Amino acid sequence: MNSSIGKFFVAACLLLGGLLYFTWMHFLDDFYRQQIPAEVEVGAMLYADSGIRGGCGSAIFALGPRSKAQLVLSGKRALAGARLESVDERGPGISKDWKETPYIYRDKEFRAESYWSTLSCSWISRTRYDTIMGALDKPGSFFRQYKEGVTLVIPSADLVVYLFF
């Protein structure tokens, strides 16, 4: 009898843990999607992680096929109206416009201290890290900086990356 109660308890704990995990992942998916302008069509969330205290992190989505086609056809013009009302756009070096890569590091800005360094807060795979950092060095990707985050759209890799700090 005690054995069946123990098995039931373990099964109930596993079920509850699974439900909590999927609820948390759904919350993160929804929260991070709100940080991407609606004009940038995103598919499935491929990755999300933040530092131990949540001070920095990243979310990576698949780029939707319509957005990719528009970006390939029109370039940065496809993002002309892409705005977020919920983010703070004030501060030094922050522009309300989307920019095309390559990313030009500002005077005295070290790569390790740039917007892109928040990738190191996440347990991102080396290949995905190289894809994102490589996209910053060549033309064809688009980014928009906010006071506490940045969105990077990489059509060549079918990725949309949101970094926050």
Predicted regions and their residues:
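N-terminal Sec-pathway targeting helices
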Residues: 1-17
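N-terminal export/targeting and maturation segments
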Residues: 13-89
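Compositionally biased, low-structure terminal segments
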Residues: 9-10, 32, 143
